[in-house]
């Protein structure tokens, strides 16, 4: 191997060489490759491409030219790097989903939002867009400095005039050495309004600037969640902006829904987003999606359709998609740009200040250039005027001269002309000697004098120059400004939960005997008069019926207490919303019940962390327990123990209390005991409890409720055969915990055993559910008020083998208050006898007809007389029993 000549070998320490070479490389990447200039918002490769297009005359009014021709010209003259890097930069400037205001007008395949690459440069064509001309306008009027290209044979601009704020309009992104930039695009109208406000008030604050510039405006539209990230980025130059797709939930028939995505976040690859959704569905991380397809087209724009299973909650699925897929992502703002050739982190105001200063410089240099040109032209015109005034002498002098040089010198000496003036006279054509041409020269000269005065006035007064900048920016705003694409949604979105996407509304959750659960809007049911047939609430399976019902808000917690004394928790919206006739979904799909475990009580709670509330439990054997609500704030999906009891016992009911209530416990044989809650010592979550009521043989607890000490509430009793009544709470005296209680109704074959004992105010509605799935909604005020021992009046007519399975209270809403009360009318026949009364129950729910029931008045009167007699006998029997107990 031949040795290298000694003169070409330079021995250096490797550490020093690596340090210096890396610094040189790093500085080259920072200042000449990866970071944009704060003035025109362009990196060198983009600036060279646009300048090359301008030099080749590829303006919007000219035909397209091959991309390969553009790339080759730029690479050969200005950018000695790979042709693919130049082409990729040009392609990006042509993509309307990458640039808010594209700078290249491409023809052919220039890629897609799915990450598809552009066609080869030999196939595509390009030219400048109209707005690009504003970046290059006045570039030939000495408005910017030119520098040598890489080999010194060409000149290229160091910066473009940039007649609009391109740095913020189209944004920028790039990775340098030790730093990176990521600037979001903005709306041109808002940006120019911000620059105008800054020009009028240099001390303007960023908060005031944000009145003009709301926030980033992405080319793919979408949503921005909140303004806190925007404000932080504008104030410090760094911040995180939450972006979200625009998605709507559509009905697709048969009670099914679909999620349709029409806008996606900026820089999100649509194809990868769809793949991510499919992956989550395949891995069972998101449940309820049956189909996923991309229906995007040139006609419809972006359209990604996600079909949702009938029993799934589309809103919750959408929220999960936001959390786990690029449907929602963040844009990390890092506003680093080159300021005076050095990288600097800038905020919003600094970016606008530097741009405004650049525009003032451009306009000033352009004015100076125009002034020089105007003065030069005026100087020539002055020479022509002299020549016209002495035309004969001028001609004689020229004729006497032997050469052009002699003629020029003679003209200069004789008429005191400059070299340029003398040359202009020599170049003047004979036709300029006519009178008409003389008038034109005079007019042009006078116009030039006025123009020179205007230019000098601009240069003499900074405010006049600034107003010229404002006028030109306003003109650009009016020509190219457009409406915002990205919507900014205000609100706290930093820690999004499921309920943030779900409107808060009153709902009804029903649970069937075979553990099928669903939810419905409470407005599904309308108030009816007592005695009505009701509304079909669900189509139950064979031997199944609605066993429990509770009303709550979609944002409330639902605590599920089981017969085995365990507790589970769901949010209201987590229960699928289904049609009124749907049977629901198996409850085991929502909560993880153990074998042979049945839900005995559902209650709604807004704040599980409350220290002022308690839960009171009652078991079938008469055991009660009080426990702080906060003991149940952390419930796992597999549940926790809520109360312990003997094997032959089970949990009947749970109530939420304030700690100062009276406890009412009712039994199936119509016994009721009332005692102060304060007599119950708070116990731990897994404690057993104490005796609440002493039960007679064959009796069991069926109801638990609470009332205030001086309550004007009433005790509502409903029996299994559809009878009910109201009795004032104060008719039930306070007694010691553990007693046998007092009678609250007379049990006969006619009305049956008690199925519900609860307290009411008279301002609620009552929802009664039968084992056949029929639901009726009544105004509690329509139910008769009777004594403790009365049997009650008929609330709902039952068919064969039907019985009341559950009862729930519903708060009256505005819709029910506006409903017209259905009237029961009584008519008298011509012979004076009272005809049968007909109660018409109007079910206004769509798809249901008017139901008509015949009520026998004689039967009702007889029932009333029997109730009065029975009430008297029961009171006598109670007094005798009480005396025996006291003895």
Curated annotation (Swiss-Prot):
Site Confers resistance to the antibiotic ciprofloxacin — annotated at 84
UniProt keyword list: Antibiotic resistance, ATP-binding, Cytoplasm, DNA-binding, Isomerase, Nucleotide-binding, Topoisomerase
Comp. bias regions, Acidic residues: 813-823
What are the boundaries of the region Disordered? 811-864
Gene3D superfamilies referenced in this protein's UniProt entry, alphabetically: 3.30.1360.40, DNA gyrase/topoisomerase IV, subunit A, C-terminal, Topoisomerase II, domain 5, Topoisomerase, domain 3
Would the keyword rRNA processing turn up in this protein's UniProt record?
no
Compartmental location: Cytoplasm
* Nucleotide-binding recorded as keyword: yes
Record: active site? 123 (o-(5'-phospho-dna)-tyrosine intermediate)
Cellular component per GO? chromosome; cytoplasm; DNA topoisomerase type II (double strand cut, ATP-hydrolyzing) complex
In chain numbering, where does the motif GyrA-box fall?
528-534
Q: Which reaction does it catalyse?
A: ATP-dependent breakage, passage and rejoining of double-stranded DNA
Which family does the record claim for this protein?
A: Belongs to the type II topoisomerase GyrA/ParC subunit family.
Q: What does this protein do?
A: A type II topoisomerase that negatively supercoils closed circular double-stranded (ds) DNA in an ATP-dependent manner to modulate DNA topology and maintain chromosomes in an underwound state. Negative supercoiling favors strand separation, and DNA replication, transcription, recombination and repair, all of which involve strand separation. Also able to catalyze the interconversion of other topological isomers of dsDNA rings, including catenanes and knotted rings. Type II topoisomerases break and join 2 DNA strands simultaneously in an ATP-dependent manner.
Subunit info here reads: Heterotetramer, composed of two GyrA and two GyrB chains. In the heterotetramer, GyrA contains the active site tyrosine that forms a transient covalent intermediate with DNA, while GyrB binds cofactors and catalyzes ATP hydrolysis.
The name this protein carries in UniProt is DNA gyrase subunit A
From the broadest rank down, the organism's phylogenetic lineage runs: Bacteria, Bacillati, Bacillota, Bacilli, Bacillales
């Amino acid at each position: 191997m031949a040795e290298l000549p000694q003169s070409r070998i330079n021995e250096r320490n490797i550490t020093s060489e690596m340090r210096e070479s890396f610094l040189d490389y790093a500085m080259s990447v920072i200042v000449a490759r990866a970071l944009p200039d704060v003035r025109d918002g362009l990196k060198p490769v983009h600036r060279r491409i646009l300048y090359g297009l301008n030099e080749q005359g590829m303006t919007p009014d000219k035909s397209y030219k091959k991309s390969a021709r553009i790339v080759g010209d730029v690479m050969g003259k200005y950018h000695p790097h790979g042709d693919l890097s130049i082409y990729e930069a040009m392609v990006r400037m042509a993509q309307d989903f990458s640039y808010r205001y594209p700078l290249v007008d491409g023809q052919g395949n220039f890629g897609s939002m799915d990450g598809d690459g552009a066609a080869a440069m030999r196939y595509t064509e390009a030219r400048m867009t109209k707005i690009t001309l504003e970046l290059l306008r006045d570039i030939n009027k000495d408005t910017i400095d030119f520098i040598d290209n890489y080999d010194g044979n060409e000149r290229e601009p160091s910066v473009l005039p940039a007649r609009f704020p391109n740095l913020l309009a189209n944004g920028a992104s790039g990775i340098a050495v030790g730093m990176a930039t990521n600037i979001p695009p903005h709306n041109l109208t808002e940006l120019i309004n911000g620059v105008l406000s800054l020009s009028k008030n240099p001390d303007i604050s960023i908060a005031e600037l944000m009145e003009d510039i709301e926030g980033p405006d992405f080319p793919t539209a979408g949503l921005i969640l909140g303004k806190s990230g925007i404000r932080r980025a504008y104030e410090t130059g760094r911040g995180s902006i939450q972006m979200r797709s625009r998605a709507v939930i559509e009905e697709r028939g048969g009670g099914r829904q679909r999620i349709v995505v029409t806008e996606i976040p900026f820089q999100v690859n649509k194809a990868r987003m769809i793949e991510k959704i499919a992956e989550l569905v395949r891995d069972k991380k998101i449940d309820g999606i049956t189909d996923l397809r991309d229906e995007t087209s040139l006609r419809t724009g972006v359209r990604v359709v996600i079909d949702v299973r009938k029993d799934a909650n589309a809103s919750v699925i959408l929220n999960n998609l936001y959390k786990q897929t690029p449907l929602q992502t963040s844009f990390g703002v890092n506003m680093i740009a080159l300021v005076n050739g050095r990288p600097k982190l800038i905020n919003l105001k600094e970016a606008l200040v530097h741009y405004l200063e650049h525009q003032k410089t451009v306009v000033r240099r352009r004015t100076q250039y125009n002034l020089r040109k105007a003065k030069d032209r005026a100087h020539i015109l002055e020479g022509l005027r002299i020549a016209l005034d002495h035309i004969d002498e001028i001609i004689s002098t020229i004729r006497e001269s032997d050469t052009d040089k002699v003629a020029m010198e003679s003209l200069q000496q004789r008429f005191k002309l400059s070299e340029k003036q003398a040359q202009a006279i020599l170049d003047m054509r004979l036709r300029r000697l006519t009178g008409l041409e003389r008038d034109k020269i005079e007019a042009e000269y006078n116009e030039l004098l006025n123009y020179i005065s205007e230019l000098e006035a601009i240069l003499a007064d900074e405010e006049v120059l600034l107003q010229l900048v404002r006028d030109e920016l306003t003109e650009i705003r009016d020509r190219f400004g457009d409406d915002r694409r990205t919507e900014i949604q205000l609100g706290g979105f930093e820690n999004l939960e499921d309920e943030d996407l779900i409107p808060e509304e009153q709902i009804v959750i029903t649970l069937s005997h075979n553990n099928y659960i669903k939810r419905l809007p409470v407005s599904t049911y309308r108030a009816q008069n007592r005695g009505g047939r009701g509304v079909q609430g669900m189509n139950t399976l064979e031997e199944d019926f609605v066993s429990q019902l509770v009303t709550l808000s979609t944002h409330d917690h639902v605590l599920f207490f089981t017969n085995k004394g365990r507790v589970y928790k769901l949010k209201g919206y987590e229960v699928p919303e289904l049609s009124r006739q749907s049977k629901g979904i198996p409850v085991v799909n929502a909560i993880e019940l153990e074998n042979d475990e049945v839900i005995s009580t559902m209650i709604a709670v807004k704040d599980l962390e409350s220290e002022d509330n308690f839960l009171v439990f009652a078991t079938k054997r008469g055991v009660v327990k009080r426990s702080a609500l906060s003991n149940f704030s952390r419930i796992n999906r597999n549940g926790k123990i809520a109360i312990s009891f003997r094997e032959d016992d089970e949990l009947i009911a749970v109530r939420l209390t304030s700690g100062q209530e009276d406890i009412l416990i009712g039994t199936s044989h119509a016994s009721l005991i009332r005692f102060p809650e304060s007599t119950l010592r708070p116990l731990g979550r897994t404690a057993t409890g104490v005796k609440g009521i002493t039960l007679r043989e064959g009796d069991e607890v069926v109801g638990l409720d609470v009332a205030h000490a001086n309550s004007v509430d009433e005790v509502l009793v409903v029996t299994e055969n559809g009878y009910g009544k109201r009795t004032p709470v104060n008719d039930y005296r306070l007694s010691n915990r553990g007693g046998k209680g007092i009678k609250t109704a007379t049990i006969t074959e006619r009305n049956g055993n008690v199925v519900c004992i609860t307290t009411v105010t008279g301002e609620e509605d009552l929802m009664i559910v039968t084992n056949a799935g029929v639901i009726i909604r009544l105004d509690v005020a329509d139910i008769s008020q009777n004594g403790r021992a009365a049997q009650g009046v008929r609330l709902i007519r039952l068919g064969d083998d039907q019985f009341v399975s559950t009862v729930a209270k519903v708060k009256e809403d505005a819709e029910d208050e506006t409903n017209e009360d259905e009237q029961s009318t009584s008519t008298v026949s011509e012979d004076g006898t009272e005809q049968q009364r007909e109660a018409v129950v109007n079910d206004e729910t769509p798809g249901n007809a008017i139901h008509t029931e015949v009520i026998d008045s004689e039967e009702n009167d007889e029932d009333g007389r029997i109730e009065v007699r029975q009430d008297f006998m029961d009171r006598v029997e109670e007094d005798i029993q009480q005396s025996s107990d006291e003895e």
